[in-house]
């Protein structure tokens, strides 16, 4: 997040994560409060230099993709997004696995409804679902925002799609990525 140290400390204490993924900027903030979170595993992304006690994300990727076989209660928390905190400290909004799954289904239904409505209004034949290509989404919003996760990452992952991440918004870079990656879906802030 874009939190300053005291906000970061509050969010970490409130959510009790096991692993913290952070880039250079957030890592620098975290290192000032790290002693309060001694058991927190820290993974660095886009780091300029290695840091003691911080695992580089490239090393994580080398370990392979095997995940443990676990049982998930659909009503357990899947993620926590924090509000902006306009009336005090940010509040953790918890999303369940069931809620995230329903969101994916609702987005799929809404997308198909919009497509079929557009085809009908324009006297076009709907495309054959067998010809559908996986989503290729350009993510221009921060991953700590619900829009990037629920509206892009979840449906793209569920459909076998591709996410192309922009670290910071740059219109020229976005155009290059759209062309090079053949982006089919873009969501951004007006």
Which positions does each model-derived feature cover?
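Conserved AMP-binding A3 loop
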Residues: 78-118
């Amino acid at each position: 997040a874009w939190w300053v140290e005291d906000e970061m400390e509050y969010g970490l204490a409130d959510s009790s994560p096991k692993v913290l993924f952070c880039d250079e900027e957030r890592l620098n903030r975290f290192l000032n409060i790290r002693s309060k979170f001694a058991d927190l595993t820290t993974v660095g992304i886009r780091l300029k230099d290695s840091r003691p006690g911080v695992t580089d994300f490239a090393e994580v990727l080398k370990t392979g993709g095997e995940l443990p076989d676990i049982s998930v209660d659909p009503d357990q928390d899947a993620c926590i997004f924090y509000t902006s905190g306009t009336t005090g400290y940010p509040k953790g909004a918890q999303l369940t696995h069931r809620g995230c799954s329903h969101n994916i289904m609702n987005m799929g239904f809404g997308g198909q409804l919009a497509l079929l409505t557009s085809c009908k209004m324009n006297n076009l034949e709907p495309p054959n679902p067998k010809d559908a290509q996986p989503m290729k989404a350009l993510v221009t919003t921060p991953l700590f925002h619900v829009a990037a996760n629920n509206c892009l990452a979840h449906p793209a992952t569920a459909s076998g799609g591709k996410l192309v991440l922009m670290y910071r918004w740059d219109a020229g870079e976005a155009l290059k990525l759209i062309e090079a990656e053949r982006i089919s879906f873009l969501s951004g802030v007006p």
